[in-house]
Amino acid sequence: MDKTKRLFLKSKRSFRRRLPPIQSGDRIDYRNMTLISRFLSEQGKILSRRVNRLTLKEQRLITIAIKQARILSSLPFLNNEKQFERSGLTARPPGLRTRKK
């Protein structure tokens, strides 16, 4: 093979195949919180199929299970618990809100 043809050949990269996110023994159910929580974002949103690497059927079942768990209040609809940290007390400027005695 001459050099001109070698330039167009792609090198075969070895890649490790990822494990499927849902094993064959896993049951997609609204009570299986460990499985369901893997497919939620930090904000509590359902992740897309491309991110999850699920088939269409699995994604549909996961979505239904998450929605059932939310309705039965096993899962929150929103996960927006923000940690507010106040660093010391802030002094208020005197002026508009002064109390009259």
From Swiss-Prot:
Coiled-coil segments: none
Ordered alphabetically, the record's keywords are: Chloroplast, Plastid, Ribonucleoprotein, Ribosomal protein, RNA-binding, rRNA-binding
The protein's predominant localisation is plastid
Residue span of the signal peptide, if any? Answer: none
Subcellular localization is given as: Plastid, Chloroplast
Q: Name one GO biological process term.
A: translation
A GO term from the CC aspect: ribosome
* GO molecular function list: rRNA binding; structural constituent of ribosome
Is Plastid one of the keywords UniProt gives this record?
A: yes
Top-level taxon in the UniProt lineage = Eukaryota
Check the record and name the Gene3D superfamilies matching this protein.
Answer: Ribosomal protein S18
Q: How does it assemble?
A: Part of the 30S ribosomal subunit.
NCBIfam families according to UniProt? S18 (TIGR00165)
Family in the record: Belongs to the bacterial ribosomal protein bS18 family.
Name of protein: Small ribosomal subunit protein bS18c
Q: Give the species.
A: Citrus sinensis
From the broadest rank down, the organism's phylogenetic lineage runs:
Eukaryota, Viridiplantae, Streptophyta, Embryophyta, Tracheophyta
